Amino acid sequence: MLTYHQSIFKMIMANWLNSDHVIIDTETTGLMASDEIIEITIINMRGEILLNTLVKPSRPIPPEVTKINNITNEMVADAPAWCDVFPAALKIIRKHKWLAWNSSFDARLMVQTCLQTGFFDDLKPHLITSIIMAIETRHIDAKAVYDQWYGEFDEKRKNFKRQILATAAARHGIPTAGAHRALADCLMILGVLKQVCQPEVA
């Protein structure tokens, strides 16, 4: 039986599933301030794909990154540039709140990819501010809520333990094939939410 604490977070996740929120995942050249998005996927709560594309970065993908996400420089050689991809993503973000697993990372990478690729270069300051606000104020961290629901406490951090997406998916019987590719990760997030929100068996 769920605790009262778990019931609250289950209700939050159930509300997401019944909303027009979308789920976003990005794959990147790395984690640093100079890194860029090389793949982005957006799906809705029915699992329908709204956007799913590789992105050609302005610099090569490091080999150690390819080992994680299996995205090679050859795969992105003919992919569209971020400046061509982002307007479609922004149109969706302006209309919908969006979830991601550690959403602050995806939000940061969207903004810094705009900076790295020159997307902001010819825009007036108020438009740049509007875009950044649309990204930064409309995201929801699905991982943080799941962490609270799962309830594994980290005594060292004095907080709930951070749950890895693939681990959470496997825990709930969600296929993890293709992990660290954007579409697979989006579908894992959706699958985890659906499994958490299944009615309890008496």
Regions found by a protein language model. Name each.
Residues M1-D20:
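N-terminal accessory regions of nucleic-acid-interacting proteins
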Residues I8-M11, D84-P87, P125-H126:
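A generic local structural motif
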Residues A14, N18-D20, A33-E39, N44-I71, ...:
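Metal-dependent phosphoesterase core characteristic of DEDDh/y 3'-5' exonuclease domains
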Residues I68-P87:
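Metal-dependent phosphoesterase signature
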